[in-house]
């Protein structure tokens, strides 16, 4: 949603644009934590959103007000924006877009608000970044092209959130919030996303009020699984997580600790569960009871 306001002065025509962008959070239906490992995921947008609204200024100051968390941020459009804190996403988005040909000659007054639970695993940070990038692509003084697709916004968000800071995460959060709906994502060999126009039942999202331990999860799930893959490839160089039959995992039991073997079984099970669900989504022949069973199996293995 956007609006255009034109102000005339005796000396020149000055155009100020007011822009309002909103982006949904997401839940992962199938493949949770597997995008870290190059496997596909299926995610769904939720009805909780982040809103970014604002207008251009006459100078190069950017002021961002975040009343929900009683915070604000101010910086200026210098030629090379330096990061002053971890995950400095407001600046990284501008740097990424500039490298792709976007030009920003004026600053902005911006307000951010939303109702996605923070640090709860529903992609509040990615939804914020996607909204901010979408806002910036509209507000740029010069653009490499007239329109930008939702997929491209997702790609920019991956660059600004993950690649720019060397983060170990995957691509699900950025693409699922940028694309919305129910989305299937493959990250290898190159990002590819499909949107499924299927209707599922209602989901109830509960907030435990306990912060998500992102680094702890990554240490166990991603790096733990990468260690397992390294062990198995030394035993069998042909091993590939994407194709290895789950029923053959037993032959590696003696090569792994009990915890490693359980993690391997869980990843193989989650991979195959996603494939079954994907088949239903692609044909739009949804068996709600079976979807529920698959969701339960998936959650049990996490």
Where are these regions (language model features)?
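C-terminal nucleotide
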Residues: 14-28, 51-88, 98-99, 184-302
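Short, well-structured alpha-helical segments that form the helix of a local strand-helix-strand
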Residues: 150-162, 288-296
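ATP-binding N-lobe of GHMP and related small-molecule kinases
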Residues: 3, 14-126, 130-150, 164, ...
């Amino acid at each position: 949603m956007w609006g255009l306001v034109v102000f005339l002065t005796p000396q020149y025509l000055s155009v100020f644009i007011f822009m309002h962008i909103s982006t949904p959070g997401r839940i992962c239906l199938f493949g949770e934590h597997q995008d870290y490992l190059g496997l596909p995921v299926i995610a769904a947008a939720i009805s909780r959103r982040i809103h970014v609204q604002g207008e251009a200024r006459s100078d190069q100051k950017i002021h961002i007000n975040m009343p929900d968390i009683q915070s604000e941020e101010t910086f200026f459009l210098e030629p090379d924006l330096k990061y002053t804190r971890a995950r400095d996403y407001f600046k990284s988005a501008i740097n990424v877009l500039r490298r792709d040909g976007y030009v920003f000659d004026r600053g902005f007054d911006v307000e951010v608000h939303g109702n996605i639970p923070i640090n709860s695993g529903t992609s509040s940070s990615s939804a914020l970044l996607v909204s901010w990038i979408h806002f910036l692509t509209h507000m740029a003084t010069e653009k490499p092209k007239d329109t930008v697709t939702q997929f491209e916004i997702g790609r920019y968000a991956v660059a600004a959130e993950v690649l720019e800071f060397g983060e170990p995460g995957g691509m699900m959060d950025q693409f699922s919030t940028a694309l919305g709906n129910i989305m299937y994502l493959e990250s290898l060999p190159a990002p590819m996303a499909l949107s499924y126009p299927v209707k599922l039942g209602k989901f109830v999202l509960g907030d435990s009020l306990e912060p998500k331990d992102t680094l702890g999860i990554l240490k166990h799930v991603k790096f733990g699984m990468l260690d397992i893959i390294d062990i198995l490839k030394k035993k069998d160089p042909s091993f590939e997580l994407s194709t290895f039959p789950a029923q053959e995992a037993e032959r590696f039991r003696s090569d792994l600790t009990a915890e490693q073997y359980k993690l391997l079984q869980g990843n193989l099970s989650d991979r195959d569960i996603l494939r079954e669900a994907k088949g239903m989504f692609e044909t739009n022949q949804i068996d709600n009871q079976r979807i529920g069973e698959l969701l339960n199996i998936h959650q049990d293995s996490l």
